[in-house]
């Protein structure tokens, strides 16, 4: 795998879906990129970028408030020397929460058929989903903060239901 030449060094920088990893072998980039990327990821990342860039159009008020609070409001934490330091979520955490909100509020995902609309590979079939519970698609690497995302998703779910 290779990274885009302009890939940011900061884990907080907002990534354009076109600037993710890509095959180092030039031939694979042209012929097999769609086979290397998990089937739902590519389309969803583009849709979530549009959702983010629009200011979360289509999200419920509670969802917008939480997303703006978590990701656009400065959160200052005291350091041991008494100075303040800004806390930020990793971009991967932000994108994961934005994806969940997008799928729930905007798309209205109810079942596997709703998710299959995002399959850009043609490789996903209903037989791959034996269970009937609602799914949300979040792709995160090891060490990217999945536990924190789960805690934010629980808080979002609680306040979303309450308000």
Where is each model-derived feature located?
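Generic alpha-helical propensity signal that fires on short helical segments
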Residues: 30, 107, 154-158
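Walker A/P-loop NTP-binding motif
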Residues: 99-101, 146-163
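N-terminal accessory nucleic-acid engagement/regulatory domains that precede
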Residues: 1-87
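Conserved pre-motif I regulatory segment
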Residues: 55-139
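The conserved Walker
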Residues: 142-144
